[in-house]
């Protein structure tokens, strides 16, 4: 915030200093400060550690709501070469950083960095595209963090024994993981599909290749979590909170999961009907 304010003051004083201040350099400092506030690479160093110390609801705010203002300001600056560097680093670091994580909050943090790379790439194309992407990403993140918050899940080994007799909840949780990763035909594929179409029209094939490869890596560690949790034998965890399966929170989660899994079909049907 200090860097952002300082560079803004420099930009305002530019005319009073006989143009001795380079405007593009000042804009680059402002852009770097905004990327730092949003948690984009290479200014992401604070984001996973901050996520690890937050509750799930506060982590959700950090992953979604706190990104709106920086991204809106970035869309007005739109320094393409700096955005391009941040997009490439964000999708790569977000994918590779989540490979060996055992903490669910850090896993979601690196997933957020990867998705932020997709949102920044959509900023280079159209403001409406990134708003659509941000809306779907926020919804899918809310579904997962809502469930993690209900059952107090913070580490992967808790998933292995989590509600061993409730295969439905386990199955829906992992379907939401795959939807967040952008696997078709789930809802999370729709915003990625829009970005892929627009990047193809702009002939950004190399950038698109890197982004799709990073998505495959994120899907790999999501699938690894799913496979391990379904194949591991049951063992007792004293910190697992027992809950009544027929509760309002669980019912709300199942309703949101329905839209997460079948939302793409419903949107496609609505589009072809009207």
Swiss-Prot record:
Pfam families: NADH_dehy_S2_C, Proton_antipo_M. It is an enzyme of class 7 (translocase). GO terms for molecular function: NADH dehydrogenase (ubiquinone) activity. It is found in: Mitochondrion inner membrane. InterPro entries: Complex_I_Subunit_2, NADH_DH_su2_C, NADH_UbQ_OxRdtase_chain2, ND/Mrp_TM. The keyword Magnesium does not apply. It is a multi-pass membrane protein. Its EC number is 7.1.1.2. One of its GO terms (cellular component) is mitochondrial inner membrane. Signal peptide: none annotated. Its main location: mitochondrion. The chain crosses the membrane at residues 28-48, 54-74, 79-99, 107-127, 128-148, 171-191, 206-226, 254-274. Keywords: Electron transport, Membrane, Mitochondrion, Mitochondrion inner membrane, NAD, Respiratory chain, Translocase, Transmembrane, Transmembrane helix, Transport, Ubiquinone. One of its GO terms (biological process) is mitochondrial electron transport, NADH to ubiquinone. It catalyses: a ubiquinone + NADH + 5 H(+)(in) = a ubiquinol + NAD(+) + 4 H(+)(out). Belongs to the complex I subunit 2 family. Core subunit of the mitochondrial membrane respiratory chain NADH dehydrogenase (Complex I) that is believed to belong to the minimal assembly required for catalysis. Complex I functions in the transfer of electrons from NADH to the respiratory chain. The immediate electron acceptor for the enzyme is believed to be ubiquinone. This is NADH-ubiquinone oxidoreductase chain 2. It comes from Drosophila mauritiana (Fruit fly).
